[in-house]
Amino acid sequence: MRELRHSSKSGAGHHTNAPCPIHSPFFWRMGGIPRILTGICSSTALLALTLLAGCKPVGPNYSRPGYDAPAAYKETGATTVVPPPAPAGGGWQPASPSDGMLRGKWWEIYQDPQLNQLEDRIAAENPTLRQALETYLAARDQVSAARAAFYPTLSAGASATREEISANGPNYSPGKSTTYSDFAVSGQASWEPDFWGRIRRTVEAARSNAQASAADQANIDLSLHAEMAADYFQLRGLDAEIALLNSTVIDLENQLDLTQRRLSGGIGTEADVAQARTQLETVRAQRVDVGVARAQYEHAIGTIANLKLSDFSIPFSPLAQTAGLALPKVPVGVPSQLLERRPDIAAAERRAAAANAQIGIAVSAFYPNINLTGTGGFESMNVGTLIQGPSALWSLGAQATELLFDAGQRHALTDAARHTYEAQAAAYRSTILSAFNDVEDQISGLRILEQESAVEQRAVDAAQNSYDISNQRYKGGVTSYLEVLTAEATLLQNQRTAIDLQTRQFVSSVGLVRSLGGGWDANQLPK
C-alpha cells in the first residue's frame, strides 16, 4: 500500500497521486470516524448517565386497581367439587398465583382420545390463534422499538462537491482560482437523556400492552379449545339421540307390522295401522333433523381444527357409549385465585398498567427536552489530504427547549390520560365481576343439571314401565293402540330429554373449566 504523502508546498486544493483515503494508515491510526464518535459520545454520555441514575420517572407509579374478592364462591356450598386424578399424559391442575409451572392439557380429564386428537390440532393449525400470535409478536417488537430510544442514534455520511464561484461575487479574491473542490466524511451522534422518564414510561406502556396482547392470545386459545370440546360433546349427544331414534324406528316398524297383522286377523283397525305409520314417519323425520344438526357441529369442529371439510368426518359414537368418557369433577379453588387464572382479567389489568404509564408520558411534556449532539469527521479541498489530522473537525453540543405556551394542550392531554386510566381500571373491575358471575353460573348450572338429570332418569324409568304395560295391554286386547302411542311418545320424549341433560352436563363442565381460565395463570405472561 502506498502511503499518502503531503507536501507543504501544495495547497489544500492541490491534487496528489494517492490511494483511497479510507485505506490510509493514518486513518486507521486515528481510528476513523467510529473512534472520533466514541470520543465525542463518551464524555457527554458519562455525565448524562450519572445524572440519570438519580432521576425517577415523572407520573404516578402503577399499582393494581383494588378489588375485594369474596372468600368463597356462593354456589360451591351446594355441591362437592374436588380435584380429579390426573389422567395419563398430563391433566388439568388447580392453578395457584405462586405456581408458574405450565399446566397440562385440561381437556384430557375427559379421557376421550378423539377429542384429544382434535384439540391438539388447534395450536398448530388454527388461523385465528395464529393471528393472535402475530399480534402479540408485533406488540413485543414495539417494546424493542421503545427501548431503542435509551441509546444514541449514530449516522455517517460522505460528500464530494465541485464548485465555481462568481468572479464578480463578494467571495471572489483576485489571483485565486474561482473553481474548487470540497470533500467530507463525517459522523453524527444524537442522544436524548431520559431525565424525566418519558422513555422509561414509553417502554413501560409498550411492555404492558405486549403482555395484554399475550393474555389476549391465551384467552383466544382457551376459547378455541373450550369451543372445540363443547361442540364435540354436542355432537356426541346428537349421536346418542340418533342411536335412540334408530332403536325407536325399529320398535315402531315392529309395532306397524303388529297392527297390520292384527288388522289382517280381524282384531285390529285401520286407524291403528294409520296411527302406527304416522308415529313411525314422525320419528324418522326427527332422525333426519338431528342428522342435520350433527353435520353442522361436525363442520364447526373441522373449521376450528382447520381441516378440509370435504375430507373430514367424525365416526359415529353415542355419548353414553364413548369408551372411557366420564363427567369429571372440576377443581374450583377460591375466588382470589381467579384474578391470576383468567387471561381476560390479566389482559384488562395490563391495559390499565399501560394507561397508567401514559400519564407519565403526558406529564413529561411539562419538562424541558434535552438533546446531546456530536459531530466528527474530516473535510478537505483535496481528496488526498482528506484523512489527515489538519482536516479533522468535530463539534459537541447540548440543546434544551421548553414549551412556554400551548393554550392548555398539555394539561388537556394529561387529564385525558388520567381519564383513560380510570376507564381501564373500571374495565378491569368489570371484567372481574363478569368472571365471578360466569363461574357462579357454571357451578350452579352443573349442580342443577345433576339434580335434574337424576329426576329425569326416574321419569324415564316410569315412562318405560308405562309403555311396557300399555304394550302388553294392547297385545292382550285390553286397550286401544292410542294408549300405546301415547306411552311410547312420552317415553321417547323423556329419553331425549335425559340425553340432552347429559350433553348439557358435559358442555357445562367445559364452560366451568373455561370460566376458571383452563390451566392458565398470570405467571405465564412474558416479562
Task: Label each residue range with its predicted role.
Residues 31-32:
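Glycine-centered motif in EGF-like
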Residues 263-267, 474-478, 515-519:
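A short glycine-centered flexible hinge/capping loop motif at secondary-structure junctions
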Residues 39-53:
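Bacterial N-terminal signal peptides
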Residues 56-227, 369-374, 404-414, 421:
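Short flexible linkers and secondary-structure junctions
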Residues 161-165, 304, 377-381:
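Structural signature of outer-membrane beta-barrel domains
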Residues 130-131, 147-148, 193-221, 271, ...:
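Sec/SRP-type N-terminal targeting helices
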Residues 49-124, 183, 207, 291-340, ...:
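Terminal intrinsically disordered/low-complexity segments used for targeting and assembly
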Residues 199, 215-334, 445, 449, ...:
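Periplasmic alpha-helical coiled-coil/stalk elements that build and connect Gram-negative outer-membrane
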